[in-house]
């Protein structure tokens, strides 16, 4: 034991009260720092779960990706899981009780994608193909069309064309411009209602001027440039 250790030990024994206070203070400080770190970690986990529940379980989003580019993203070493969504068009909702929402935005997802979406299944199953449809509980409650799981319905499918300053734009979002756009009929399509889900406001918000309908989709059914 060198001279420094000897002097330190001598002073510790000579000032027992001060030594005890110092030890207690150190213990309390370490405990407080540990508690703060634990609280911060818990808060971050809670925040992450809240965001995932509201927006979906994902970290990065790529938009306007062609079908032939999806494998490149899926096979990247940084990709743990992925979802694929495709805008399928619009369907008019004749008889909807909500005067502001008279159409449904149809979006197709690959079967493995539905589990990543911010929604909770209430009844039924996920769609498996583009003739099966999943709707929100909000739609059931507000549109009041009395759609039931297992029911087959026929919808007028098409798109909304917005002309602004001589520029034509096909709407692919329910962003408040549907009422100003012109309906373009494409085909009459038959769907089977296979599920009802509680969707987060991020997926289907009450501020939107259209409901959301989710269909099944097979990636290999899309053309390379879709």
Task: Annotate each PLM feature.
Residues 1-31, 44:
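N-terminal Sec/SRP start-transfer signal
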Residues 3-7, 38, 188:
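Charged, alpha-helix-enriched surfaces in structured cytosolic catalytic cores
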Residues 41, 45-226:
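Basic-flanked hydrophobic alpha-helices used for secretion and membrane insertion
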Residues 34, 38-42:
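Transmembrane alpha-helix boundary/anchor motif
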């Amino acid at each position: 034991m060198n001279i420094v250790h000897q002097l330190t030990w001598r002073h510790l024994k000579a000032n027992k009260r001060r030594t005890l206070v110092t030890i207690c203070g150190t213990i309390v400080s370490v405990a407080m720092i540990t508690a703060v770190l634990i609280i911060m970690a818990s808060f971050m986990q809670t925040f992450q779960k809240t965001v995932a529940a509201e927006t979906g379980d994902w970290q990065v989003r790529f938009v306007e990706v062609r079908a032939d580019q999806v494998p490149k993203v899926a096979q990247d070493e940084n990709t743990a899981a992925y979802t694929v969504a495709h805008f399928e068009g619009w369907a008019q909702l004749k008889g909807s009780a909500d005067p502001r929402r008279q159409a449904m935005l149809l979006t197709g997802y690959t079967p493995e994608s539905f589990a990543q979406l911010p929604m909770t299944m209430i009844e039924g199953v996920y769609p498996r193909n583009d003739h099966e449809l999943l709707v929100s509980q909000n739609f059931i409650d507000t549109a009041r069309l009395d759609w039931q799981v297992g029911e087959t319905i026929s919808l007028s499918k098409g798109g909304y064309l917005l002309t602004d300053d001589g520029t034509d734009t096909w709407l692919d979002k329910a962003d408040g411009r549907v009422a100003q756009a012109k309906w373009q009929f494409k085909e009459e399509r038959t769907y089977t209602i296979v599920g009802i889900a509680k969707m987060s406001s991020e997926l289907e918000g009450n501020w939107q001027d259209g409901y959301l309908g989710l269909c099944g989709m097979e990636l290999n059914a899309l053309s390379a440039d879709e």
